[in-house]
Amino acid sequence: MANVIKLRKGLDINLKGKASKDVALQVSETDEYALVPEAFVGVTPKVVVREGDHVSAGDALFVNKACPEVKFASPVSGVVTAIERGDRRKVLCIKVKADAEQTSTDFGKKIVDVMDGDAVKQALLEAGLFGYINQLPYAVSTTPDTTPKAIFVSTLRDMPLAADFEVELLGNEQAFKTGLTALSKIAKTYLGAGVNQPNVALMASKEVELNIFDGPCPAGNVGVQVNHIDPVNKGEVVWTVDPAAVIFFGRLFLTGKVDLSKRVAVAGSEIKTPGYAEVLVGTPLSAFVVDQLKTTEHVRVINGNPLTGTQASLASYVGGHTSEITAIPEGDDKDEMLGWILPRTDQFSTSRSYFSWLFGKKKEYALDARVKGGERHMIMSGEYDSVLPMDIYGEYLIKAIITGDIDKQEQLGIYEVSPEDFAVAEFVDSSKLELQKIVRDGLNTLRKENA
């Protein structure tokens, strides 16, 4: 029997343009793919290929400079055409021109049931998939020298316009189950699901503990689930794995090959027919997003969801952890005379500042990317905690990070949080602070101090 955890704090933001599971979007043919190191937080990339080299799917394109054992696999076979760099020679992406006939490095099929934790780790390291595992504390890509006390997989995606994992699971049930079994060989594994995810619930086994989360966003955040099941104390480590990566792991053990294909949601109020596209990690957005845009002007394209994603362009690529591509109005062409004094029935407000609350919680909004205000002092106390379903004092933690008080940060639970946990708090924040950036900077500083 699954353990049901009910959460009251949080906020569901209902945006127009949710992806329909019945709409399969066309993906234009492309021979250019790219792996973006920035998608793997905490990794300093060291490129191990040169322009002109031929690679097979599964061969390493770059490694983690701090831990060269952790490789990152090419999604396709082909010729390396470019290694793009930015300021201070930062690696932006490694481009590969795909072969007409794809070839994959064969790592050999494996029977997960007879493997131990070390064998599972080694298999993931060899295939260039280990870097898809993240860790708490610090919310970064992990390394094999860490020993997790538990592993968490959250299949509940409840951020606005987020992809439904039930759609991605269709046809990948065996791979997902195999991936979960493999992770359970390393440490106790917890599977988090929502109340409306019956297919995910069927994936649970005796090796994996199933927990059902019932509550508003951000109940699906893996950090929230860790906080309610097995909190992280100083000196402890837990691993967190995106469910799409679990499928990658399962395919590796079942076929012996690296297959980085996934179903990505294309959603948002600026999308003609929101749906799902079958793509590879590294697919250019121009191959499946450009034809779906209502207009290419005054549009914010986001690699991810509107709260935690990163601003992208049609020249960007699907990231290693991307589950949706969203498009919302930029808002830079709006001119609202007396906007603050109008009823604004089409605008969302958590404080009932507009009359839109009269239409109920099911009303959908076409929100744009405007901040509508500048940074100001933190005066409204309790705002963050009202939407943060964790046993921490979010407001005091943010203040401790801003002031650089490491001792206070540790006392207030910084080891348990990741930037995405503060995404909803950032949305409701009347002080207009970039809370996710503040948390990320604090975690990076703490990681350097403890290195």
Range-by-range predicted roles:
Residues 1-48, 63, 213:
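N-terminal, Lys/Arg-enriched amphipathic/low-complexity engagement segments
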Residues 27-29, 79-85:
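Short, solvent-exposed cationic patches
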Residues 43, 49, 66-69, 273:
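Short, solvent-exposed loop/turn positions at domain surfaces
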Residues 49-63, 82:
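Short, well-structured beta-strand-loop connectors
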Residues 69-77:
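Short coil-to-beta-strand transition motifs
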Residues 70, 84-287, 291-451:
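Buried, small/hydrophobic-residue-enriched core segments of structured protein domains
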